[in-house]
């Protein structure tokens, strides 16, 4: 009887094979159902964001370009990383090289998301605190360059972190069929500073300044400050919309930080951190689930996103000239 209760081997014909994780049937069914729904939601909602910003010309703005980069990262997370992490329950069946590629993509996409958050904070800082020079300093060309550099830096950082794993994909395996990567304390500290503490410090400094300016602007509007010219009244309206955008994107950043804190707290507490193991699920899934929360925030706070969803779902997006439709 005891032999029957032991977890089965991932590869029965190999003595050094890992063993499958065994969970109660109801727990497994509930976990797979909930996480599968989250994965589908992540893919669909982020795809809607990508289609919306790419298709409609009115949405081709510098801020939305940053949201597009973030949506692409979140979409790939939902399409590639989350299903593989859900499927991996102690048995990795896709080979060592695919394991290394899987961990690389996880590092890359998380780093890109962090970089996009920093760029969004910089964008809002200039828009709110230095609006006179926003259109001249923040151009589409410069934002595209920053987005490209963000992805390239994230790739370089991920390759450096995983340099040993990429050379020898099976070096961290304790049994055949395992997909893990061990981060040493020194490497974890570098990763912590580069992808969390440093960006959080930058975001906190920039948004604290944005908050102060936004509060002063809100007080000025409530006190009915006299507006002399039409140009100034338009500037006030523009500032009001910029402040509203800053509030929405501030919520996106706060949610991201809340979802990331548990993982980095574990990284700080441990002398070495096991990445990709089946038992390291809770904090990693919190980071993954953040990818589905961003478009949900857009639904509640961005009227243009709700309008574009209607265009896409009703297939009006296929009509000639739909890219020039008014969605703002």
Give short role names for the model-derived ranges.
Residues 24-36, 62-122, 127-137:
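Extracellular TM2-ECL1-early TM3 structural module of rhodopsin-like
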Residues 39, 69-78, 146-158, 195-200, ...:
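Alpha-helical transmembrane segments of multi-pass membrane proteins
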Residues 10-22, 91-103, 108, 130, ...:
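Loop architecture of class A 7-transmembrane GPCRs
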Residues 212-259, 263:
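Intracellular effector-coupling site of seven-transmembrane GPCRs
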């Amino acid at each position: 009887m005891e032999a029957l209760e032991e977890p089965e081997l991932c590869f029965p014909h190999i003595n050094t094979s890992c063993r499958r994780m065994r969970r109660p049937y109801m727990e497994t069914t509930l976990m797979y159902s909930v996480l599968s729904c989250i994965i589908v939601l992540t893919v669909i909602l982020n795809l809607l964001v990508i289609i919306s910003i790419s298709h409609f010309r009115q949405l081709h703005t510098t801020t939305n370009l940053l949201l597009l980069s973030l949506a692409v990262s979140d979409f790939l997370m939902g399409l590639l990383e989350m299903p593989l992490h859900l499927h991996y329950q102690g048995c990795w069946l896709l080979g060592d090289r695919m394991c290394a590629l899987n961990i690389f993509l996880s590092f890359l996409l998380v780093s890109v998301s962090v970089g996009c958050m920093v760029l969004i904070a910089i964008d809002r800082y200039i828009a709110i605190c230095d609006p006179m020079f926003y259109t001249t300093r923040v151009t589409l060309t410069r934002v595209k360059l920053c987005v490209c550099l963000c992805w390239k830096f994230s790739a370089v950082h991920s390759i450096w972190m995983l340099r040993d794993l990429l050379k020898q994909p099976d070096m961290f395996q304790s049994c055949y069929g395992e997909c893990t990567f061990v981060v040493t304390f020194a490497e974890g500290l570098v990763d912590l500073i580069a992808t969390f503490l440093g960006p959080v410090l930058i975001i906190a400094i920039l948004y604290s300044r944005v908050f102060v300016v936004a509060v002063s602007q809100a007080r000025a509007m409530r006190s009915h400050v006299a507006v002399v010219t039409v140009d100034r009244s338009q500037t006030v309206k523009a500032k009001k919309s910029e402040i509203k955008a800053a509030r929405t994107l501030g919520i996106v950043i706060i949610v991201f930080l809340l979802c990331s804190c548990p993982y980095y707290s574990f990284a700080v507490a441990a002398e070495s951190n096991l990445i990709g193991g089946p038992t390291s699920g809770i904090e990693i899934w919190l980071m993954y689930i953040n990818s589905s929360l961003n478009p949900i925030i857009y639904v509640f706070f961005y009227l243009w996103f709700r309008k574009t969803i209607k265009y896409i779902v009703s297939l009006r997006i296929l009509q000639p000239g739909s890219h020039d439709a008014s969605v703002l």
